[in-house]
């Protein structure tokens, strides 16, 4: 698939949220995120900048209830955008990983754009919230990206003290791992990177 076509626009409207998201995999890290959840916007900004993705997200939701529905649906849309933008996934490097330090915290993410969704998150947090985002949601957000992006995603905080730093390390590592996994390997000549011939 030519790099110029690796974009996607997703709209999701439910009784709980209204979301518009646009992704350009082959971007330069331009970000416009307005979800109503400041810490989530911060993480999406870091994710896209470290992955060099162009990302635009405008979301409104039932934040008078809590942040769960809005944060979850944004990550559902993000996963769907990657799946749509990658098409048949021809020529992809496909698998990649990244370690990212954030001060005293170290995060690790490995991804396989296999078409088979699975997610493992190994991270312990000591505070219930970082900003407006519950730390109990972090694993669920990564799961939403993995399931709807049809990718195998493993994320781990190896160590750290500050929960903000831990989450930041994970989102940066996810951006960098996906940047590498979505690159085109010219040696494949546009072939699907699987012995099955399909992803």
Curated annotation (Swiss-Prot):
Give a Gene Ontology cellular component term annotated to this protein: cytoplasm
Q: Name the Enzyme Commission number(s) assigned to this protein.
A: 4.2.1.19
- Where does this protein act, in terms of pathway? Amino-acid biosynthesis; L-histidine biosynthesis; L-histidine from 5-phospho-alpha-D-ribose 1-diphosphate: step 6/9
Membrane-traversing stretches:
none
> Primary place of residence?
cytoplasm
GO biological process, alphabetically ordered: L-histidine biosynthetic process
On the tree of life, the source organism's domain of life is: Bacteria
HAMAP family per the record? HisB (MF_00076)
The record's comment on protein family reads: Belongs to the imidazoleglycerol-phosphate dehydratase family.
Know the name of this protein?
Imidazoleglycerol-phosphate dehydratase
